[in-house]
Amino acid sequence: PALIDLIRAGRRVERHHPWPRVSVDGGTWRSAAGALADGSLSLLGLWGEPSRVHMALLDNSTSNIGVISLDCPDRRYPSVAARHRPALRPERTIHDLFGLVATATPDSRPWLDHGRWQMQAPLGQRLDAAPDPAPYPFLPAEGDSLHQIAVGPVHAGIIEPGHFRFTASGETDR
C-alpha cells in the first residue's frame, strides 16, 4: 500500500506536526512492514513509548512523510524486522528501554542492556533486573577469506578507551 492508504486506514492523532500521524491496528502495521519490504516505503524511524510503538515512513513515489502508531496493551506488537531487516536494531532498543516485545522477530537478543542494568525496561514498567542474565551471544564473522584484527586497548581522544576487533576480507594486513 501507499503511505496515503495507511494514513486513511488509521485514526488521526490531532495536533501532530509537521507530518500526519495516525493510530493503526495490527493489520495496517503489518501492511506497512510489507511496503517497506517491497521498497515502496522507506523507514525514517521506529521508536517506542511505554505502551505504543511508532514508525515514521517516507513514500518513495510521492516523497510524502507520515507517522503510524500502534497501541500495545499486551506489551507486544508485530515485528517490522521480520519483513524489513533495517528495523531490527530499533526493535531491540524498544524492547530494552520499554519492555515491548516484537513478535516473530528474527533476533531477540538485547541491544543496549547486556545484563548490567539494575532494572529491565527503565523507560517502561521498570521491572527488577533479571537475577541471572543470559550470556550475550555476539555473532562471529565467519569465512575462509576473513581475518580478525584485534586493536586495543586504545583511546580515541574524546571517547572512552575501548578494545575493538575488525574483520578484513581477502587480504593480509601486516
Language-model-detected regions and their locations in the chain:
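Terminal low-complexity/charged segments
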Residues: 1-173
